Amino acid sequence: MADAQMQVAPTPTIQMRTEEDLSLPHPSAPEGLPPPPPKETFSKFQQQRQASELRRLYKHIHPELRKNLEEAVAEDLAEVLGSEEPTEGDVQCMRWIFENWRLDAIGDHERPAAREPVSGGNVQATSRKFEEGSFTNSSDQEPEGLRPSGGDVQAARQMFETKPLDALRGQEEATQTTMREPAATGDVQGTRKLFETRPLDRLGSRPSIQEQSPLELRSEIQELKGDVKKTVKLFQTEPLCAIQDAEGTIHEVKAACREEIQSNAVRSARWLFETRPLDAFNQDPSQVRVIRGISLEEGALPDVSATRWIFETQPLDAIREIEVDEKDFQPSPDLIPPGPDVQHQRHLFETCSLDTLKGERETEAEVPPKEEVIPGDVRSTLWLFETKPLDAFRDQVQVGHLQRVGHQEGEGLVTECLPSNGTSVLPLSQGVPQNDGLKGDVKTFKNLFETLPLDSIGQGEPSAYGNINRGQNTDSAEQSQGSDAPVYAMQDSRGQLHALTSVSREQVVGGDVQGYKWMFETQPLDTLGRSPSTIDVVRGITRQEVVAGDVGTTRWLFETQPLEMIHQQEQQKPEEEEGKGPGGPPPELPKKGDVQTIRWLFETYPMSELAEKRESEVTDPVSKAETQSCTWMFGPQSLNPAEGSGEQHLQTSQVPAGDRQTDRHVFETESLPASNQSSGRKPVRYCSRVEIPSGQVSRQKEVFQALEAGKKEVPETTINLGSIPTGSVHKFTWLFENCPMGSLAAESIRGDNLQEEQPKGSAGHGTPERQETAAERTLRTLHATPGILHHGGILMEARGPGELCLAKYVLPSPGQGRPYIRKEELVCGELPRIVRQVLRRTDVDQQGLLVQEDTAGQLQLHPLMLPGPGDPGNIEDMDPELQQLLACGLGVSVSKTGLVMQETGQGLVALTAYSLQPQLTSRAPERSSVQLLASCIDKGDLHSLHSLRWEPPTDPSSGPATEESQRVPPTESIIHVTPLDSTMEMGQLRISGSTPCPPPSRAAGKVVLPNGKPVAQAPLQEARKKRDISHAGQKGKAASGRPEASPLGSGAPDLQEAMQNLRLATAEAQSLHQQVLSRHPQGSDPVATSMPVQDVLQASTPATGVTQGSIRPVAGSEARIPAVPRKLL
């Protein structure tokens, strides 16, 4: 029996060898290798053919070896599933599944589906039973067919909406019921439910059944904190809905969330929409509905309250943005219903006081006034309260009665600019006799002050209750003021002056913070026609706080400057600059007539204190604690900054003067001088830092410049190769994640140009095309075969050791398109552990489905029996096919394995396990992953290695040179060969066979073995010839059916011989594949062509027993190839 098995083992090698010889014959001589065929020849057929050959080799593995492999798989699964304690990845995955699975399906597994068709029933009889409480003899009255489950509110609501009560069981049965029970009533519970949820005008209407809410409730969370109840409801939009932002862009609404917060007397609701751009996918515009508005309908009855949210939608293809004038929307007088004028009533409430709206005007003649109104000028009094401190009225104003403010000669109601203190004084006229006939309507003026701004009150018109003589005095005062009083002006950033017509101040108090906002109303200065001597420019506003006892007074002072002084200052400035000269040293002390000093004095001090400035500096400053002053200076600058290399900085100064302290902060920009270096590529960076310690103002400036050309520098984007040890994981991980495979040559590894390659054509296109993800590709493959996906659910796919891709997908109606992913996330976890956690649920359907893809691309469906809820969930209880699929999901596998959770019609969770073949990817250079490359090498995936390998250019001189070729003389190239050992494993052989070597760029070549002895080119050619002879010898042995003698005896299973035969067959397949895929330049010297490492390995393989005399393996050498040459792909 053992002999028969050993005779059958080499059989696949013979057939594969024969097919390979027929399709790709060996050259007659090693000197004349044919040119490689084009890439199009190696299509998917070739890849499937190689995969089928590997499967056939696996079938003919020795039974003992196959049994050992199955035991190793079972041990791996037992090791993963052995610990009962959940890991961090398990908790994260199960939480993700809990959040994205329907919450209403958890814990209620016997509830029928929401859209399950419900057959009709006798609703009237059922309602009567509920009202009377009689449930006897109910079996004979119930129909024998399928009845809806008890308490199905949705089914009862649908029946009440579509059918009348007397027609639910037919007219005859309704008549008999009425005869037996004259006082037949309806379903009170259902009717009340209808009245609470539906408006009265919609009850019983048939079109209501066709209305579908665009929102579908997925989860509801209620939080109760004290008397505040917060409800968060998560909806999903079906069908597709969109929303339009303020800019007109339309976004798809993926999910909607509504937060309701309800307390004692406050109830608020907020809608949150999760959106994505509408152009990111292709959808039919007729299927998209744009949400135009959300309205809330509330209905109140004596004991019933109803609230309904209504979404007003519009089809996307029906939107026509048309600009319509406002005149088209004017209301027609015929459509205005007769009734109270709401706008007029609203205007009255906004403008009139409450006591005038209660009918006080009609009863004014009957009710005597409560208090006699004292005549007075309300405008002057209000002006006094806004401008004068409270302590100024103690000696001038009488308590109890307001005195009328009169005008003295040459004075008006405006301020006078006095040079002594800069304040405005308006004395009160106490000698004006009171006139009993003059009365002021306080309520009217109060209404005016509450509703109208101060500048809009008619100042030129005489008051209706004022005196005629007083009005004449006001006009004369205004005329005299127009010729003598100065005009205040402000200067903008452009240097232009504007006359001030009104000044208003807003004060904002929030907690302990007070803010002031000044607004100036101006007009052009040239329209006034005034002389410069009567124009004062407002330079700053000073806020002065005076505390006297318990009363605090705030005084705002406008500091002005005559316009003529500004012109003199501008004329003196260039004269002073010319007098200094460019070479003269700057004066240490400010001289008389220094423009900068005078300007600083004008900006910080009022005019009345400039004469006493020097004396105040010599003497000790008198500090008054009860007075604080803070000045904001208006320092307009030109829009075009001065172009000069002078140093600009931040200036902070504190000057005590008299009873005030002024702080001035001048922030100016800092220009970057041009670099005078000749290189031009070294950047110059300036970093300015201002440090202000306690009690002292200092300025420090640090300038960091680029190093000189002769100094050593380490660029930020380069990595020194000498400082990196051999096998640095961080270095090569960075290379594989940031550089394309085609640029991983020795120069890029050395760190000269480690720059990320930009994709070609990205600048020409405005929006790049969206790439299909791996999860979407898997869903598309599963959806192509009917019977696999029948409901939306969760997709779990293994991406690598300890990584899972969880995706929530939505399955549209049949004919509406393919499924799409609503949410996708990459989490940590093991697929077998998650499967075991899912199988512990009580609502899992025991009848599962296993989907496997064959070599032809067809999906094979097999039923899968899952353990029940009561089973412990051991490895032995699972299906063998499921065990093999879970074992593939543990490590790095080429095939895509995963699990699909979806809901059945009975509310159960159906599990579908799948294993798909890897699909063909583009040959364009792309960023690779270290895990993907390691998996391809370990598994022997020739197609993936070929798609990721580096292809040399046609010109051998332009190819990248390795580090070894740079250290040897230019006339030689060294190929390092690691011989095979008899204890080499299959994974190591696949690594050596699938690792091509870059072609040498020199004319001559030699082979250096690990023992350090070079081998000439002729022995290398002899080794290749002997390799062919060894292949022929093996072919003859397999054809004759006489295997070699086993050292263990003919009776024992020869495991060593089976391993050698399998190793030889795999090496043959890989050698043939590498020979065809290797590029050989036409017309070049055959000696200079690239020889794959596989050829030398085959020449040195001791399994053949023929070529051991030419090349001997070195004792103690490693069987695995070092990690550094693996990077030269």
Swiss-Prot record:
Keyword Transmembrane helix listed: no
Question: Looking at the keywords, is Repeat present?
Answer: yes
Q: Which organism is it from?
A: Mus musculus (Mouse)
Q: Give the region (Interaction with CTNNB1) as residue ranges.
A: 535-636
Q: Which residues carry this modification: Phosphoserine?
A: 205, 208, 213, 295, 332, 353
What main location does UniProt list? other
Q: Where are the Xin repeats?
A: 89-104, 121-136, 151-166, 186-201, 226-241, 264-279, 302-317, 340-355, 376-391, 440-455, 511-526, 549-564, 593-608, 625-640, 658-673, 695-710, 727-742
The intrachain disulfides are: none
The listed locations are:
Cell junction, Adherens junction; Cell junction, Desmosome; Cell junction
Q: What protein name applies here?
A: Xin actin-binding repeat-containing protein 1
Record region (Interaction with VASP): 1-54
Which ranges are annotated Polar residues under compositional bias? 469-483
Q: Which GO terms describe its molecular function?
A: actin binding; filamin binding
Q: What is known of its domains?
A: Xin repeats bind F-actin.
Spell out the family assignment given in the record's similarity comment: Belongs to the Xin family.
Q: Which UniProt keywords apply?
A: Actin-binding, Cell junction, Phosphoprotein, Repeat
Q: Which PANTHER family match?
A: XIN, XIN ACTIN-BINDING REPEAT-CONTAINING PROTEIN 1
Q: How does it assemble?
A: Interacts (via N-terminus) with CTTN; the interaction promotes CTTN localization to intercalated disks in cardiomyocytes. Interacts with CTNNB1. Interacts with FLNC and VASP. Interacts with F-actin.
InterPro entries hit by this protein: Actin-binding_Xin_repeat (IPR012510), XIRP1/XIRP2 (IPR030072)
Q: Where is this region: Disordered?
A: 1-49, 111-151, 459-485, 567-594, 633-661, 753-774, 946-973, 993-1012, 1018-1052
User: Quick one: a GO cellular component term?
Assistant: fascia adherens
Disrupted gene: resulting phenotype?
Answer: Increase in interstitial fibrosis is evident at 3 months of age and worsens until 14 months of age. Disorganized sarcomere structure, abnormal frequency of adherens junctions and decreased density of the supporting filamentous web leading to greater separation and detachment of intercalated disks at 3 months of age. Cardiomyocytes in culture show conduction defects and defects in atrial depolarization and ventricular repolarization at 3 and 4 months of age.
Outline what the protein does.
Protects actin filaments from depolymerization. Required for correct cardiac intercalated disk ultrastructure via maintenance of cell-cell adhesion stability, and as a result maintains cardiac organ morphology, conductance and heart beat rhythm. Required for development of normal skeletal muscle morphology and muscle fiber type composition. Plays a role in regulating muscle satellite cell activation and survival, as a result promotes muscle fiber recovery from injury and fatigue.
Q: What tissues harbor this protein?
A: Expressed at intercalated disks in cardiomyocytes of the heart (at protein level). Expressed in myocytes where it localizes to actin filaments prior to differentiation and is then expressed at nonstriated nascent myofibrils and Z-bodies during differentiation (at protein level). Expressed in highly differentiated myocytes at immature or mis-aligned Z-disks (at protein level). Expressed in skeletal muscle.
